[in-house]
């Protein structure tokens, strides 16, 4: 009830009747917004934060469980998958995966994102300009995070032999297996695209899968390196979408807030 409305007790009955002394469109709109907010609170829904909304808690817990199982399974099959790919290697597929992994590096994604953002700006499409720039930001976050983790973990690549151990292995690229920077960057890059437009993002999903396979086939990473990098890329994409694309996805809530 708005401030212009006043409660009035009817004599002799004890029941409360409500009377609007100032009936106006503004008064009705205020009452409608109040009742709508109460309904959203009662149902546990809101237009707000992706990370604290009650309805998303279940999906976060489910995602944590799936990620934990995937990482544990990947570590278990690390050696077996690497040995299988080495035994079934051929020259044609090796050359193909070599060129795929060249495209999957972060400079190519970075340049592609900036070019697409420039094209969208030239065409006056602010929405897609913001999406492409968000893809670049997610790529940068995932790439930097992966590189820092690489230095801290210093895991040897599958192709590294024991006799090649180096005194400064922590800063050598031969010991930067965990996690895969290529997979983290491509997952974050196309992950933002999938969250912004799932049809276009789904069409680009084979690119991410090919990049991940190429890193395994070239003995640059173990299976666990690729799986953990994909999780890092997904988290980077979710973070960027939440902070940079939320006004696009929820324009009405952005206006009201």
Residue locations for each model-derived region?
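Cysteine-centered motifs
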Residues: 2-5, 27
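Short, basic, low-complexity termini and linkers enriched in Ser/Thr/Gly/Pro
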Residues: 10-42, 57, 248-257
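N-terminal transmembrane-helix/juxtamembrane module of multi-pass inner/ER membrane proteins
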Residues: 37, 44-113, 150-172
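Membrane-embedded catalytic cores of phosphoryl/pyrophosphoryl-handling enzymes
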Residues: 40, 53-54, 60-61, 165-257
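Aromatic-anchored segments of alpha-helical transmembrane domains
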Residues: 68-74, 140-145, 208-220
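Membrane-interface loops
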Residues: 80-83, 125-195, 200
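Hydrophobic, aromatic-rich transmembrane alpha-helices
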Residues: 111-120, 186-194
């Amino acid at each position: 009830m708005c401030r212009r409305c006043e409660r009035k007790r009817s004599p002799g009955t004890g029941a409360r009747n409500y009377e609007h002394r100032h009936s106006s469109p503004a008064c009705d709109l205020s009452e409608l917004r109040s009742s709508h907010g109460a309904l959203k609170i009662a149902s546990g829904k809101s237009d707000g934060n992706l990370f604290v909304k009650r309805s998303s808690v279940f999906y976060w817990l489910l995602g944590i469980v799936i990620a934990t199982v995937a990482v544990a399974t990947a570590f278990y099959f690390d050696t077996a998958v690497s040995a299988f790919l080495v035994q079934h290697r051929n020259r044609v597929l090796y050359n193909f995966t070599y060129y795929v992994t060249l495209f999957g590096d972060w400079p190519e994604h970075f340049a592609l994102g900036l070019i697409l953002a420039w094209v969208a700006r030239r065409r006056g499409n602010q929405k897609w300009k913001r999406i492409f720039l968000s893809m670049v930001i997610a790529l940068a976050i995932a790439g930097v995070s992966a590189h820092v983790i690489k230095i801290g973990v210093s895991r040897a690549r599958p192709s590294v032999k024991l006799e090649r151990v180096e005194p400064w292995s922590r800063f050598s690229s031969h010991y930067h297996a965990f996690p895969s920077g290529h997979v983290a960057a491509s997952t974050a890059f196309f992950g933002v695209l999938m969250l912004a437009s799932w049809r276009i993002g789904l069409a680009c999903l084979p690119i991410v899968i090919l990049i991940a396979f190429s890193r395994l086939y070239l003995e640059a990473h173990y299976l666990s390196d690729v799986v953990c990098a994909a999780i890092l890329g997904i988290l980077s994409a979710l973070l960027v979408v939440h902070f940079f694309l939320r006004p696009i996805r929820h324009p009405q809530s952005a206006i009201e807030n």
